[in-house]
Design a protein with these regions (language model features):
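Short coil/turn connectors at secondary-structure junctions
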Residues: 1, 90-91, 124-128
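Short glycine-rich, Thr/Ser-proximal phosphate-binding strand/loop in the N-terminal lobe
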Residues: 2-47, 51, 153-158
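Residue-level signal for inorganic ion chemistry
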Residues: 15, 85, 194
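Short beta-strand-loop/turn "lid" adjacent to the catalytic site in phosphate-handling enzymes
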Residues: 51-96, 100, 104-113, 130
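ATP-dependent carbohydrate kinase catalytic cores
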Residues: 67, 94-123, 216-231
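Glycine-rich phosphate-binding loop of actin/hexokinase-like ATP-binding domains
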Residues: 113, 117, 124-185
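A mobile "lid/hinge" subdomain adjacent to the ATP/sugar-phosphate binding pocket shared
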Residues: 179-232
Length: 235
C-alpha cells in the first residue's frame, strides 16, 4: 500500500510517499517546500505526485482545527477540503490536526528515539503532552485508554492566555499587549514569538537591534545570538 503523508505548517509543507506492509512503513520519497507565494496546497501536491504512480490513500496533518473533512489554517491563508482533493487526485484524503498526528506518533517511539532532559518516575496510564514551537505553538494532550494506545485530543492550546508570574513578565505582557491586544502563549513560544521576546529584551536593556528582525531567518539568528553573553543575560 502506498500512502501520501503530509504535514502542512504555517511556514513549510513536508510531504512523503510511504510504502506500508503490515506494521512496517518505509519512506520512498520526501520533500519540504515553502508555503510563501503559493495560493494553496493543490499545486504543491500535484508537483510532488508527478510521476509517483499509483497512490492508495493520503493523510494530511494541518496546523489548525479540522473535522477530518475540511480545515482552515491558523497561521496561513489557506483552506483545504478533503472532497476537493480526492476529486482532483483520485484517492481518498483524510485531514488531521498536526499535533493530533504528533500525539499518535508518540505511541510508536522507542527508547532509542528519545532524549531524556529530566529523569522522573514513569507512571502507568498517565497522560502525556506534546508541545512544539514553530510558526505557532502546537499542543497535544494524550490520554490513556483501557483497550489501546494513548489517544490524542485535538487542541488549539497555544492560544490560551499568557499568565505572568513575576514583575518582569508583567512588563512583558504590557509590552506585547500594546502590539497585539490579547496575548496568547503562542505570542511568546513560537518563531515570531522569539522575535517579540528579543525586541522586549532589547527595549529593557536600552539597546537597538544589530540584525534585520524582518528577515525570514531572524528567529534563527536570534537563537544564535542567544548563545552570546548579552543574550544569556536576558534568558
Amino acid at each position: 500500500m502506498k500512502i501520501l503523508a503530509g504535514d502542512i505548517g504555517g511556514t513549510h509543507t513536508r510531504l512523503a510517499l510511504a510504502s506500508a506492509e503490515g506494521s512496517r512503513v518505509g519512506i520512498d520519497k520526501s520533500e519540504r517546500v515553502l508555503n510563501a507565494g503559493r495560493d494553496g496546497i493543490e499545486q504543491v501536491l500535484a508537483d510532488f505526485l508527478a510521476g509517483a504512480g499509483r497512490v492508495d490513500a493520503a493523510c494530511l496533518a494541518v496546523a489548525g482545527p479540522t473535522d477530518g473533512l475540511s480545515a482552515r489554517f491558523t497561521n496561513l491563508p489557506w483552506q483545504v477540503e478533503s472532497a476537493a482533493l480526492s476529486a482532483r487526485f483520485g484517492l481518498p484524503f483524510h485531514l488531521v490536526n498536526d499535533f493530533a498526528a504528533v500525539g499518535w506518533g508518540l505511541n510508536t517511539l522507542t527508547d532509542a528515539d528519545i532524549a531524556v532532559l529530566q529523569t522522573g518516575q514513569e507512571q502507568a496510564n498517565a497522560s502525556r503532552v506534546a508541545l512544539g514551537a514553530g510558526t505557532g505553538l502546537g499542543v497535544s494532550l494524550c490520554v490513556a485508554q483501557a483497550d489501546g494506545p494513548h489517544r490524542p485530543l485535538d487542541s488549539e492550546g497555544g492560544h490560551i492566555g499568557f499568565a505572568p508570574t513575576d514583575a518582569e513578565q508583567d512588563r512583558l505582557l504590557v509590552w506585547l499587549r500594546a502590539a497585539y491586544g490579547r496575548v496568547s502563549v503562542e505570542r511568546l513560544l513560537s518563531g515570531p514569538g522569539l522575535i517579540g521576546l528579543y525586541r522586549f529584551c532589547l527595549a529593557e536593556a536600552g539597546r537597538s537591534a544589530t540584525m534585520d528582525l524582518a528577515a525570514p531567518a531572524a528567529a534563527r539568528a536570534i537563537s544564535e545570538a542567544g548563545k552570546a553573553e548579552i543574550g544569556r543575560a536576558h534568558v
